[in-house]
Amino acid sequence: NVIIVCLLAITSCENNPNSYKPISSGNIHTVTVVMENALWNSEAGEHVRTVFASEFVGLPQQEPLFSLKQIPPSIFSDFTRESRNVLVVSKKRKDTFKITKNKYANPQVVVEVYGKTNKEIIDQINLHAPKAIKAIRQNEIKEKQRRIRKSVFKSEELKELSIDLSLPSAYKMHKKEKGKKLWLQRETEKGSVNVLIYLLENRKNQTPVNKAKAIKIRDSIAKIFVLGRNEKSYMITEKAYEPYFFETKIKGMQTVETRGTWEVKNDYMAGPFLNYIIQDTINNRLLVMEG
């Protein structure tokens, strides 16, 4: 029996190539860029920064898509190989692009871009950047979810609304309206981070949600639920900045995403928001979530 257990252990290790690899490390949304210093300072390096550190669309303040940390290949060894996201860019005889998962650590995404000249490297980046960005973003979402699962906010109210949502335990219930609206809040050094959840009836033959309708929905709810400090003050969508509007899917359900800036009418408060309106066909409702 002992021999069988040992054989099973050996077999499982051989069948799992990630079992002996170190755990990856790094800050969220950080990419280690492996490039020669001269190449990093060339037009190819400038293009890497333009594409992978571009401004995140829809925020009032500038925030890069990823934080880039460049190192030359000569020091890419040992612990530097354990970065969760790695982008290798180098000159080689053959144009190449590939994405490898868990190459040096686990979990990890390694993106490799090669070309004979700066122009060919830039062409490779232009051709494959969407795939690379998607792979890194998915890796970061999984890492963020892993960190959240260490200490999860638990709420009977979420269960009653048939909502499975993972949030850090630092969030507390700030305000609620039974069966319809929840306001969760996490205190920070500079203020607070808020998550709003509310349900709307999904009427038959209603018009699809477009940008104007999404703004109308959030403003109508905020006027009665998200009140300001002063009398007759409440949250509205700031009109000075045109919100960004996208169509996407969450768990296979049609979703519209709106990014913009909120402000408080009759008060001096403002900030960014990210709003999702989800067509919850399972429960025949519109699920609206905003942070």
Regions found by a protein language model. Give the residues of each.
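Sec-exported extracytoplasmic/periplasmic mature domains
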Residues: 53, 57, 134-137, 141, ...
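N-terminal "mature-domain start" segment
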Residues: 22-26, 41, 50, 54, ...
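Secretory pathway targeting signatures of secreted, lumenal, and periplasmic proteins
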Residues: 17-18, 38, 168-228, 263
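Sec-dependent signal peptide recognition
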Residues: 1-5
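Solvent-exposed alpha-helical segments and adjacent loops
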Residues: 18-35, 90-153
